[in-house]
Amino acid sequence: MRILKLPLAGLLFCVMALFAGCKTSNEPKAPVALTWEMGASDIEPGYYENTFILKNISQKPLKKNWTIYYSQLPRGVKQEGASEVKVEVVNGNFFKMYPTDEFAPLAPGDSMRITFLCTYKLDRNSHVPEGTYWVETVDGKEGSPLPVALKALPLPSPESMSGYPDATKIYESNLRLAGAPALVQSDILPSVKKAVAIEGDNVVLEGKVALAFPENFAGEAKLLKEKLTGLYGLEVVGNASVKIVLEELLDRKEAVNDEYYTINIGDNLIKISAATPHGIFNGTQTLLSMLKDKQTPYLLEAVSIRDYPDLAYRGQMIDIARNFTAPENLKKLVDIFASYKLNVLHFHFCDDEAWRLEIPGLEELTAVGSRRGHTTDESQCLYPCYDGGYDPDAKTVGNGYYSREEFIDLLKYAAERHVRIVPEIESPGHARAAIVSMKARYNKYFETDPGKATEYMLSEPEDTSRYVSVQYYTDNVMNVALPSTYRFMEKVIQELNAMYQEAGLSLYTVHLGGDEVPRGVWMGSPKCQELMKEKGMTKAHDLSEYFITQMADVMQKNGLKFSGWQEVALGHTEEAHQQLRGQAAGVYCWNTVPGSDEVVYQTANNGYPVILCNVGNFYMDMAYNGHPDERGLDWGGYVDESVSFSMLPFSIYRSLRVDMAGNPIDLNNAEKGKTALTEIGKKHIMGVQGQLFAETIRSFDGVEYLLFPKILGLAERGWNAHPAWENLSDIREEQAFNQALALYYEKISKSEMPYWAKNGINFRLPQPGLLVKDGNLYANVAIDGAEVRYTTCLLYTSPSPRDSTSS
């Protein structure tokens, strides 16, 4: 069995999750309490039944002058027939319930059931209603919001739900990891390309170490010194028996790319060589990684390492719009990302639910767009959502933004660690926060300065278009026919450019979003109809193409290339493709759900630079598995550290080993009939990126939990894009994959998890596998050394007797 004893820090989130809903407060409470329960999951095709039980906990009868608001992941509501209480969607993921004319006063202590249907499904606890609060109206005036106690009853029969982790299957899967080799010094993540033992005495680091470097590597030396001292207690001095030397690579032709480095260890000398500061930084991270699983005195065996990445772009997107991640926490992530040689932070700072970056001259974006709270007109803040609370001034995950100074500081911090930040302005869809903020600006100025009021408007008052986005918004798309829309976009781009310049950096690209524009948009807009007539357009996609080509020109005018989600490169005329190919920095291809997965290679073959963002491998917000207590989404499958590891950049159809139902995929035939990656296409695979959308995240602990350990597969595959099993088939492919996977888990077990626990990084431990055989219960776990306890106390060491009635 694989047994590991870890410090408690690594288990903290599991405990915290049990008590996440237990909040205590002395603030006034509403006169009611709610209990929510799940009903039939398929009461009608595409609908499930659920019920709120409303209880009057006050001393007075409950009248008709109230509304209860709540948040929940987006879904439609269906309520047929007469009802005493109406439930409806306000917008997106914000809902309300209120008494109808049929409502009879509810006596103190009495309860009533409010049953209704919702679309989709509900099979995990992070998707239930939350953030309930009460507003009472007296004499036509609203009172202050009051929190409503909400108890969500356990989901019925979770073990029968699709994707529920079967303990026996986990046990069988864990058997693949048997026989993992003992780790050697150079077994780090991401794996080095080549490590060879050499002649020379081993190096022992203890107490003091000398560090020598030329001036052009001073920044890398400073960071190395901080880590050696802070993590390993080594005092860096001018002269010591052991010396670390950072030096320029003598033969620059040896460098495969700008990130290439070498390390030579032996005879009291550690020499890191590279042609660039980035290469030196990579070498220092490898040195630090080799120390992770060691105890003082730190023994380093004589070795020569040659290493470089296969893919130039290795990024992680963090969504701070849905739920806010503070600057100090994002810096923590940048530091961790850099340690695994990830070199891009995709800064998703705006979406429908918030705008999180100060833009001088557009103060409403943060004065309104960064705050969520109770409102009926959104003149001062956005609607609550994702349990951000009803107080727009409270310090919650719903509120907050980065000041200009904080963002510049983040840019500098990341650049020191060779992490480039790519900002994203979601457009034209997913833009509700910006649209509402610019409406607030209009209302602020329309009487005193009409020109200023309309200068940056993103919507048209006369637009009668009817649409519903994937997230159930009806007003989240910019009007692409308004000159003010492009004025707004250019203003934000120019302010971003100025921030980068002040940080001493060059802004290369801005990600423009471009995804999930819903059907029906723009068709009721007089301005759009005028533009379509003028340009000879016949369909909504023509307007999308117009927007992205216009924005590509705006970017080019400002010395930049554009980036965007895969939609920015799809369905265009050849004339538009010719323009966009030359102006694109990156097309982020995300939809690899079966039936849509050919888009990735089609886009690369068409000459666009592609960043692989495969939902099935790299969407970190996908739940680890189907257990109802696992936070996350599951529309693209389940993603754990083995799934991210299995991704093949140059063979994406074989990147998943099971389908979305958990059934094995025939890897030998997975590519048949699919678009092949051409030689031109191969040159346009720029890199890989993980995505962490934040709809189900409620804290920074939750951010870390969903990232670690699954981000390690992303780091490994970006650095080593051609693993040993890539071109194999049948049993040889399976054996090669399992051997590599076993070594990968051994690295996680022995080096990474103990390091995370020691340094306050929250992470997930996988659940054990169980097998009942011959009257005994067998257990195993993927993490080498993890403790397995039977019931609540006994440490599992051997099979336990079990009869058919045991629980």
How should these model regions be labeled?
Residues 476-580:
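Active-site neighborhood of glycoside hydrolase catalytic domains
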Residues 23-27, 128-309, 564-570:
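Acidic, contiguous N-terminal accessory segments
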Residues 561-569, 574-770:
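Flexible, acidic glycine-rich loops studded with aromatic residues
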Residues 54-58:
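Asparagine-centered strand-capping/turn motif at beta-strand->loop junctions
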Residues 796-806:
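Single conserved hydrophobic/aromatic residue that forms the stacking wall/gate
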Residues 27-44:
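Low-complexity, acidic Ser/Thr/Pro/Gly-rich terminal tails and inter-domain linkers that flank the onset
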Residues 64-89:
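Short acidic, flexible loop segments centered on an aromatic residue
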Residues 256-476, 482-501, 505-509, 689, ...:
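Feature activates predominantly on carbohydrate-active enzymes
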